[in-house]
Amino acid sequence: MDRISGLPDELLLRVLSLLPNVKDVVVTMVLSKRWQFLWMMVPKLVYDDSYQNLEYGKFSRFVDRSLFMRKAPGIETLHFKLGQNCGNGDIQWWIRAASKFCFRELIIEINCSTSASPSILPRSLYTECRMLVTLKLKKAVLVDVSSPTCFPSLKNLSLVSVKYPGNEFVKSLLSSCHVLEDLVVEQCINDNVTIFSVKVPSLKSLVLRTSKERAPDGESGFVVEAPSLEYLDIDQTGGFCVIENGMPNLAEAYVSVLHHHPVKFLSSITSVKRLYLCLLPHSILSCMQDMYPIRCVFHRLVHITLCTCDDEWLNLLACLLKGSPKLISLKLEKHHGHLICSPSPLRDDLSSVPECVLSSLETVEWVDYEGTEAERQLVEFILRNGSCLKKFVISPESVNPDKKYEMI
C-alpha cells in the first residue's frame, strides 16, 4: 500500500475513476492519511441508486454530502443511474450543486421499469450546463422552457427513449447546439414527436433508431439536413426519412429501413463510400420499380454489405451493381433472418455486365450461402466476368457435409 500511496495524485485519481461507483471511491479514504481527501478530487462521479440495494433516502443523502464536500474545481463526468423513488427535486438540486464544478459530461439514465412515475428533468439542465461537451439521456422526460436553450459547447448528444414536449421543442433544442458533431436518437412510443427534425450544419455522425414497439406510421419520420455528415446509421421500421440538400462528405452509412419508397432515401446518400444496406420486406420491390429508369449512381461507393433477408435481394443487388462503377468489395449476409423461401430469380438477365464487375470488383464474401439455382447463377456470373477478382469467399449456411457438397 505504501508503494501505491507514493504514486502521483494524477495517477491515483485516474485509478479511482475506474471504480464503478462513487461509494467505492469514498471507501478508499480509510486506507491512509494520503487517501483521506483524495476521493474529493476524482474527476469522474458515478451515482447508482441500485448499487448494493441501498435504500433511496440514504442514497439521496449520500449524493448530497459527497457533492457538498467536493474539493476539486472541476468534474469531467457526472453520471446518474436512477430508478425507483427517484425525486425530480433531487435531480434539480444535484445538477445545480454540481454546476459550479463546470462538469463537461452529464449522463442520466432512468430505469423506467421500476420507476413509479416518469422522471422529469429540471429546467436548470438548459440554463446551468453551458460548459457541457457531452450529454446522454435515457428514459427521461424533458420539459419546455420559456427562455431559449443554449448549449454552446455541446459536441455529443444521445437521446435514448426520451419524451419531449413536441416537434418544435426538438427543433429548438438541436438548433441551440451550434457545434454539435455526434447525435444519437432512439425514439420510443408516445414520445410526443411526429416529425423528428435534425437540422444541424456542424453534425458529422448521426444515429437514428425507432423502437420496435412503435407502430409503422406514414405520417411520422425523420427530416435530416446535415451537410457536414460523414457517418449515418439508421434503423427504422416505419414512417419516412427525408434528406434535405445532400450530404457530400458522407463516407459510411448503415441503412436498415422499411419504407414504401426507399429509392428517394437512397438517392440522397449517393456520395457514400461504404454502405451496409438492408431493405426490410416489402421495400425492395418498390425500390427496384423506382430505381430504374431513374438511375441511382453511387460514384464513390467502394464497399457494399447487402443483407439477404428478403427474397428479392438478388434483384436489388443487380440494381446496385449497375449503379456502383467503382465498387471494390462486396459482402452478402443474412443478418435479420426474414427470408422464408428461396430468393426470387433475376428479372434482369445482366446481358450487359456492370462496369464494376469488369473493371474494379476485387473481393466478394458470401455468408450463409444456400446454393439455390439463382444463387449459383450469380456466382457463375461473377466468376466468369470478374476481370479484377482476387478473392471469392463462400460460407455455406448449412454445416452438413452432404448439403455443402450439393451446393457446389
From Swiss-Prot:
Residues 345-408 form the FBD domain. SMART domains: FBD. It comes from Arabidopsis thaliana (Mouse-ear cress). PANTHER family: EMB|CAB62440.1-RELATED, F-BOX/RNI SUPERFAMILY PROTEIN-RELATED. Transmembrane segments: none annotated. SUPFAM superfamilies: F-box domain, RNI-like. Residues 1-54 form the F-box domain. Pfam families: F-box (PF00646), FBD (PF08387), LRR_At5g56370 (PF24758). Signal peptide: none annotated. This is Putative FBD-associated F-box protein At5g50270. InterPro entries: F-box-like_dom_sf (IPR036047), F-box_dom (IPR001810), FBD (IPR006566), FBL13/AtMIF1-like (IPR050232), LRR_dom_sf (IPR032675), LRR_FXL15/At3g58940/PEG3-like (IPR055411).
